[in-house]
A protein has these predicted regions:
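Cytosolic ends of transmembrane helices, especially the final helix of ABC transmembrane type-1 domains
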Residues: 365, 369, 381-388, 412, ...
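Membrane-integrated ABC transporters
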Residues: 1-210, 224, 228-233, 252, ...
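Loop segments that connect adjacent transmembrane helices in multi-pass transporters
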Residues: 273-290, 361-409, 481, 499-501, ...
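Hydrophobic alpha-helical transmembrane bundles that constitute the permease/transmembrane domains
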Residues: 198, 202-213, 243-250, 301-304, ...
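Transmembrane helix-loop-helix hairpins at lipid-water interfaces of multipass membrane proteins
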Residues: 194-248, 255, 327-332, 443-447
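ABC-type nucleotide-binding domain
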Residues: 117, 123, 497, 503-779
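Transmembrane helices of ABC transporter permease
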Residues: 236-245, 249, 311-361, 431-445, ...
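Juxtamembrane loop-to-helix connectors within ABC transporter transmembrane domains
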Residues: 215-216, 256, 274-321, 378, ...
C-alpha cells in the first residue's frame, strides 16, 4: 500500500497537512494553504470543528468519534485523522493509514484479555512487554512511521475524525500557478543577458574540448619526432587559448552576477508586493517568522534558476557533445564512462527522498526558530520585568539545538552520498586507467589518444558529478518553489479584475444590518448586529473584553468580510468600494500603535504623505503631542527607534491620534485610543473631539466610560451581541449592563444579597455627586 505522506510547512499546519494526506489517498491534490483557509486555521491552530467543516466542503462524509483501546482495534475506514498530545503538551493531529484490525467483537475482547495476561506475566517476571498491535501513522511534523499500539496510546486522546468520500468528492489536482513560469517571465526581459551567458558558455565548452587535444598533439606528434619548432607554436597557441578561456570565463561570471541582480529585484519585491496585497486574515493566522522565511525561499529559487540552472543546462550540452566525440575515439572506454554516469544518476535518485525530508524539516524548523527569536526580542521588556531571561534562553536554545540536530543529519546524508560518489568515481577511474593503458601497451591506442580521452572524459563525467553535488540545492529549490507558490497563489484581498467604486469621502449614514462574523472556525465574534451611525454623530461601543467591539471596527475597515448581513455607507454596500479608498476615507487609531524607524514628522504624515510641516504641527497640537515633541533634541526631525522604543505608551498614542487628525476624515474610528493617557490629556483631547470635530462621524471604542458619556448613541456589547443601546442617561435609568459597568468604574458595587441597590465597599472613598454634570467623582 502506498502511503500519501505530506509534511506540514509551519507549526500550525498539522491539521491541514493531515487532511491533505487523506485527500491524496483518494487522488485529490490540494495545497496546505487552501486547506488552512477552509478550516479556519489561526495562530492557535485548528479545532476539530474546522477540520470537519473543511472535509465536508471537499465532499467527505465525516464522523468525529471517541474510541477506547478495544474499539480502536475494530474495523473502520482508514485513512482517518487522530488527535494526539505531543511530548511538549501541545494538541496535534496525525493521519492513521493502517492498523491492527480485529473485526469480530468476541475475538477482539479475547485478544485484549490475552494481552492483559501477557502484560501481567511480563511484569511479574521483570520482562518488558512487547505489544504486537501496530499503527502506521503520518506525523506531519516528523515522518511516516510504524509504531506499536502502546506507543501510540501514550499520546492518543481517543478522538478520531473518520472520513469517507461521497459522490460530491472530486479527484484531481487543484489548479496552481507555476513558479517556474513566473520565473521564466522574469527572465524573458533579460533574454539578451541570458543569451550572452549561454554564448560564453558555448565558447568555453568549445575551447575546453579543443584544449583536450593538447596532450594528444604533444605525445603523438611532437615528442616521437622531436619537432622543437612545432612545440613552441603549439604551446603559444594553447597559452592564448587558455588566457582567452579565462577572460571569457570572467565575462560569463559578470554576466551571471548582473543577470542575478536584474532578476532579484522583481522577484523579491514582487513577493513582498504580493504579500502586502493579501487580506488581514493571512497575517492574523501566521507568525512573522513563517512569512519572512518565504523570503529565503525566493532567494533559494533565484540562486538555482540563475547560476545553477544555467550551469546544469550547459553541462548537459557539454556532456552530449563530448559523449559523441568520446564514443568515436574509443567505444570501450566510453562504455565505462557511461556506466559511471548511470551509477551517479542512480545515486541521485536513491538520495532524493532523504534529501527532500531533511530539507522540509530544515525549512520548517528555520521558521520556528525565526519566530521564537522575533517573539523573544519583541517581548524583551516583559521578559526582563518578570526576570525570565533564563527561561526564554532555554526555549531559544531548545529550538536552536533542534536546528543543529537536523543540520547534523543533513551533513551525515551529504557525507554518505559524497563518499559513495567518490568511491564510484575512483574505482571506475582506476578501471578506465587499467583498460586504457592495456590498450596502449597492446598498440590498440596511442598514448596521446589515451591522454586526450582522459582529459575529454572529465567534460562528460563532471556534469553528472556536479549534479550529485547540487542535489541538496536542487531539492531545496523544489521545496521552496512549492512553499512560495502557495503564498503567491493566495488570493489578494480584492479581485483585481473587478471594477470598484472609489470612495472620496464618507458622506451619509453608516449602517450595520444583521451582521454576523467569526474568526476562522471559532465561536461567533458577532451575532446579528444591527445599528446605524448617523452622519456627523458620535457612537460609542462599550462592553467587556472580547465582546466584539474591535471586530466591528475591523469589518468597517474591510479587514474582513461579514459572514452574513450587510454594511452600507450612504445607502451603498461597502463591498462596492475598493479597500484602499475606504481606508483612505477613514481616520483610524488602533489599540496597538505601530511606529516606524523614521522621523516623527514622517511617522505622523504616513496618513497624508504630502502634508507640510505646519499641517503636521497643527495635527500634533490637536493630539496634545506638540509640547513633548518640542522638547526632543531634533523636535519633529527626531528619528525614532524601532517600534517607537524610548517613547511612553501615552506619547505613542498621541502620535497615533495626530496621524488621525492630520487625515481630516469625515469618519474617525478610535479603538481604545486614549487608554494610556493621563486623565488631563484625555479630557483635553475629548474636549477637542466633541467641539472642534462636532460635525464629523465617530465610532469610539472605550472601556473608560467617562470619555463617551457625551456620545449621541452608546451601544453595549456582550458576547458578540448588542444588549443595550441609548444615551448615557437613558442607559443609567435602565440599570442594566451599562449601569453595572458605570457603577464599577465609580467604585460602586451591587449588593448581591440585597438585590440591585448599589452599596459602597467598606474601604471605598466617599462618593460625591457633581451637581453640574451628574458624574460621580471620587475624592
Amino acid at each position: 500500500m502506498r502511503y500519501t505522506y505530506v509534511r506540514q510547512h509551519d507549526t500550525t499546519d498539522c491539521a491541514a497537512a493531515c487532511l491533505a494526506m487523506v485527500c491524496l489517498h483518494y487522488k485529490k491534490e490540494i495545497t496546505i494553504t487552501r486547506l488552512r483557509d477552509m478550516m479556519g486555521t489561526d495562530l492557535k491552530g485548528t479545532n476539530l470543528t474546522g477540520m470537519e467543516k473543511a472535509a465536508q466542503e471537499l465532499g467527505f462524509s465525516t464522523a468525529a468519534v471517541r474510541v477506547d483501546r478495544e474499539n480502536f482495534l475494530s474495523e473502520f475506514t482508514t485513512p482517518c485523522i487522530a488527535q494526539v498530545i505531543t511530548d511538549e503538551g501541545l494538541a496535534h493531529f496525525v493521519t492513521v493509514f493502517k492498523k491492527t484490525t480485529i473485526k469480530d467483537d468476541g475475538e477482539r475482547r479475547r485478544h485484549m484479555l490475552r494481552q492483559e495476561e501477557e502484560r501481567k506475566k511480563c511484569a511479574d517476571e521483570g520482562k518488558k512487554f512487547r505489544c504486537r498491535d501496530y499503527v502506521i501513522i503520518g506525523d506531519p511534523a516528523k515522518e511516516l512511521k510504524k509504531i506499536s499500539l502502546d506507543e501510540f496510546y501514550k499520546n492518543f486522546t481517543g478522538v478520531l475524525l473518520l472520513m469517507t468520500p461521497t459522490s460530491e468528492f472530486k479527484t484531481g489536482k487543484q489548479k496552481q500557478g507555476s513558479m517556474v513560469k513566473r520565473f521564466l517571465d522574469l527572465l524573458w526581459p533579460q533574454k539578451k543577458l541570458f543569451f550572452y551567458a549561454i554564448l560564453s558558455s558555448v565558447i568555453l565548452t568549445i575551447i575546453g574540448i579543443a584544449s583536450s587535444m593538447y596532450n594528444k598533439i604533444l605525445m603523438d606528434e611532437i615528442l616521437p619526432y622531436g619537432l622543437k619548432s612545432l612545440l613552441v607554436a603549439v604551446i603559444l597557441v594553447f597559452s592564448i587559448v587558455n588566457v582567452t578561456s579565462a577572460l571569457i570565463s570572467m565575462v560569463r561570471q559578470w554576466v551571471l552576477i548582473y543577470l542575478s541582480i536584474k532578476v532579484d529585484i522583481p522577484l523579491m519585491l514582487g513577493y513582498f508586493g504580493h504579500v502586502f496585497k493579501l487580506p488581514m486574515k493571512f497575517f492574523a493566522t501566521r507568525k512573522t517568522g513563517e512569512i519572512t522565511t518565504r523570503y529565503s525561499d525566493a532567494s533559494t529559487i533565484k540562486s538555482v534558476f540563475t547560476s545553477i540552472a544555467l550551469s546544469v543546462v550547459m553541462d548537459i550540452v557539454m556532456a552530449c557533445v563530448t559523449g559523441v566525440i568520446l564514443f568515436r575515439m574509443n567505444a570501450t572506454l566510453f562504455s565505462i564512462s557511461i556506466f559511471t554516469t548511470l551509477l551517479s544518476i542512480l545515486l541521485v535518485f536513491i538520495f532524493k527522498q532523504p534529501f527532500k525530508r531533511i530539507n522540509e524539516e530544515t525549512m520548517q524548523q528555520s521558521a520556528i526558530l525565526n519566530s521564537q527569536m522575533i517573539e523573544s526580542l519583541r517581548g524583551i521588556e516583559t521578559v526582563k520585568c518578570n526576570a525570565e531571561e533564563d527561561r526564554e534562553l532555554e526555549a531559544l536554545e531548545r529550538e536552536y539545538i533542534k536546528s543543529l540536530k537536523i543540520s547534523l543529519r543533513s551533513s551525515k546524508i551529504s557525507t554518505v552520498q559524497s563518499l559513495i560518489s567518490t568511491l564510484i568515481t575512483t574505482i571506475l577511474g582506476m578501471v578506465t586507467s587499467y583498460v586504457g593503458i592495456m590498450q596502449v601497451l597492446n598498440g590498440e591506442m596511442t598514448l596521446g589518444g589515451y591522454m586526450a580521452f582522459s582529459t575529454l572524459s572529465s567534460y562528460f563525467t563532471n556534469p553528472v558529478s556536479e549534479l550529485v553535488g547540487l542535489q541538496m540545492s536542487i531539492q531545496q529549490a523544489q521545496i521552496s518553489i512549492k512553499r512560495l507558490t502557495e503564498i503567491m497563489d493566495y488570493e489578494s484581498e480584492q479581485d483585481e479584475t473587478r471594477e470598484y467604486t472609489e470612495m472620496e469621502k464618507i458622506d451619509g449614514d453608516i449602517e450595520f444590518k444583521d451582521v454576523s462574523f467569526r474568526y476562522g472556525s471559532r465561536s461567533p465574534a458577532l451575532s446579528h448586529v444591527s445599528f446605524t451611525i448617523p452622519y456627523g454623530k458620535k457612537v460609542a461601543l462599550v462592553g467587556s473584553s472580547g465582546s466584539g467591539k474591535s471586530t466591528i471596527t475591523k469589518l468597517l475597515l474591510k479587514y474582513y468580510e461579514p459572514e452574513s448581513g450587510t454594511i452600507s455607507v450612504g445607502g451603498v454596500d461597502l463591498d462596492e468600494y475598493s479597500n484602499r479608498s475606504v481606508r483612505r476615507a477613514i481616520a483610524y487609531v488602533p489599540q496597538n500603535v505601530e511606529l516606524f524607524s523614521k522621523t516623527i514628522y514622517d511617522n505622523i504624515r504616513i496618513s497624508r504623505p504630502e502634508a507640510s510641516l505646519d499641517e503636521v504641527k497643527a495635527a500634533a497640537k490637536k493630539a496634545d503631542a506638540h509640547e513633548f515633541i518640542r522638547k526632543l533634541p531634533l523636535q519633529y526631525n527626531t528619528y525614532l527607534e524601532e517600534a517607537g522604543n524610548g517613547l511612553s505608551g501615552g506619547e505613542k498614542q498621541r502620535l497615533a491620534l495626530a496621524r488621525a487628525f492630520l487625515k481630516d476624515a469625515n469618519l474617525y474610528i478610535l479603538d481604545e485610543s486614549t487608554s494610556s493617557l493621563d486623565f488631563g490629556t484625555e479630557n483635553t483631547i475629548f474636549d477637542m473631539i466633541y467641539n472642534q470635530l462636532a460635525d464629523r462621524s465617530m465610532l469610539i471604542v472605550a472601556h473608560r466610560l467617562s470619555t463617551i458619556r457625551d456620545c449621541d448613541l452608546i451601544l453595549v456589547m456582550d458576547h458578540g451581541e448588542i444588549v443595550e443601546r441609548g444615551t448615557h442617561e437613558e442607559l443609567l435609568e435602565k440599570q442594566g449592563k451599562y449601569y453595572e459597568l458605570w457603577s464599577l468604574q465609580q467604585g460602586i458595587f451591587r449588593d448581591k444579597k440585597r438585590g440591585s441597590k448599589p452599596i459602597a465597599p467598606v474601604s471605598a472613598a466617599k462618593v460625591v455627586e457633581d451637581e453640574d454634570d451628574g458624574e460621580s467623582i471620587t475624592y
